Amino acid sequence: MRIAIIGGTGVYDPKFLENPEEIKVSTPYGEVKLLKGIYQGEEVGFLARHGAGHTVPPHRINYKANMWALKSLGVERILSTTAVGSLKLNLVPGDLVILDQFIDFTKNRDHTFYNGDDGKVIHIDFTNPYCPELRNILYETSKEIGIKAHPFGTYVCTEGPRFETPAEIKMYSFFGDVVGMTNVPEVILARELEICYASVSLVTNYAAGISPNPLTHSEVLEVMTQNIEKVRKLFAAVIPKIPKERNCICKNALKEYREKGLL
């Protein structure tokens, strides 16, 4: 299995996969349930990060188990989806954003596989947090199939599960484009495992203080439901275009440490 999709809020069923089968993977961090199926002859995995029916809040997701499970199955490429609030007036509900940067405002999450417990510590480069190769395929494909997607976006990740205050949003809007609760530490852990990771955010609402109305989770789900077909269509078109050989920074993220015998 080379490719996996991680579905966020409102994305619990890949639908385009043939013969989907639930599998369980044991990891040092806990058991993970996911689906595997076939798309155009390619075995593809699908993991619902919030669990079936959105039963796991963002701050309780077992990110390390999820990423370890995908790595153990041989996954080299991950396409993820996230529901986000917009920090900019030009990013309207229903828009897709192909993320290129993130800012981490989480507080209580385990961000690394290398905590030093076994004497191993790494300091990984994050100049390009999201796989440039996958991002380019996503954007070029979106143009080919007529789906509007913003080619860049900075994701501000908060701890959750509450929505943000207008004061927080005012601060975040100075340096971010969208705000969500799940991309960190997922993107970090993927790089530590040398997995290519790209994320498409679907704008579901304007953030607090930008929107004149109070925010509700039902509003997020409603907009996600109305627009999720765009994400499915994009991923379905992208998967056959993902090359078997990787020509990106991700596959050698730990090369320096391996060469020095530190891993």
From Swiss-Prot:
GO cellular component, one term: cytosol
Family: Belongs to the PNP/MTAP phosphorylase family. MTAP subfamily.
Transmembrane segments: none
Subunit structure: Homohexamer. Dimer of a homotrimer.
Binding-site residues for substrate, renumbered to this chain: M181, N205, Y206, A207
InterPro entries in UniProt: MTAP, Nucleoside_phosphorylase_d, Nucleoside_phosphorylase_sf, Purine_phosphorylase-2_CS
EC annotation from Swiss-Prot or TrEMBL: 2.4.2.1
Domain of life of the native organism: Bacteria
Protein name, per record: Probable 6-oxopurine nucleoside phosphorylase
Organism the protein comes from: Dictyoglomus turgidum (strain DSM 6724 / Z-1310)
Keyword Oxidoreductase: no
Catalysis performed (reactions): a purine D-ribonucleoside + phosphate = a purine nucleobase + alpha-D-ribose 1-phosphate
Site (Important for substrate specificity): E164, H217
Alphabetical keyword list: Glycosyltransferase, Purine salvage, Transferase
